[in-house]
């Protein structure tokens, strides 16, 4: 399910330069257009947790995957920028619900296993996203129509999502999570203690997803416009960045067990900053790809760690902490692309990549402060429990 979620959306990303050129959008206009996806996700705020509680995480995931595939197909075949933005809005709304549901299902399976697997599950998402990037890049190189590509892509992976949901063996993932009334969920979401505990997790997750946003919306354009890479090579930027993230997540559980979540997150923030500096100052496409790979690897464990910690926030019913984090971290998407686009128009795209450099610094600082606070309090927390309530 994590794989199909990654591939359904990312297959369109290598075609963004074609879409931008077709509609005649400036960098600022393009940034404001693609932010529709994040705006849709924000509007899903109140929907995810009640749906998961009522119908169960796996059912919400596979039904949502079919809807996501449909909206992405509409985006690929859009006749105008307005239709494209509307389709992305609907896709973002659906994706936020699917994302929360698949994480609730994944955490339920993790609990039944009795060991950490959340980084590995997110690694599978990254593999799916990288696969989608390759599909889009190859389709662009072969001059396959964008609409045709997205219809075929959506059909294949919707079926795969349905099959995968049937294979989930954890009853906690398949069944309704809890029969909590809506008023209780609303009270939980408004709890000052819950917000205080979730705030650093949200900021950390935003730093991680910001790198994904750069990969999704700007890496291909950067490769084409700033390094003059051909379309097929430029399209690989998404796959390289997300592929490196996949490797980092594949190793994430092992690294976390050895160095702790704070240590891994701190190193990840440093790699994000270093990688984006390398990419922004790169003289060639090859060097830029190296920088994107470093940033992708550095961002690998930030979001999984935040989700795992959000599920343990005391006082919240199952699924609520994850749903709240999944919604709030998308607030970053509302400002990332518009800011990158505006700064790029005012200067150039190389300068605009200073924004993700800052995200790396923030992630490293959050992890460092969390580690200092834990040690200062001499809390009885096992290694790997980052920002534990």
Give the residues covered by each predicted segment.
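Helix-to-loop junctions at the C-terminal end of transmembrane segments
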Residues: 44-57, 140, 248-261, 344-345
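Helix-breaking motifs and short loop linkers at transmembrane-helix boundaries and internal kinks
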Residues: 24, 56, 77-82, 228, ...
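Helix-loop-helix hairpin linking two adjacent transmembrane segments in secondary transporters
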Residues: 121-172
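Short amphipathic helix-loop junctions that connect adjacent transmembrane helices
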Residues: 13-28, 217-233
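A late C-terminal transmembrane helix in Major Facilitator Superfamily
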Residues: 316-349, 356
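Primarily marks hydrophobic transmembrane alpha-helices of the MFS/SLC 12-helix fold
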Residues: 58-61, 65, 265, 353
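Intracellular juxtamembrane helix-capping segments at the cytosolic ends
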Residues: 97-112, 301-314
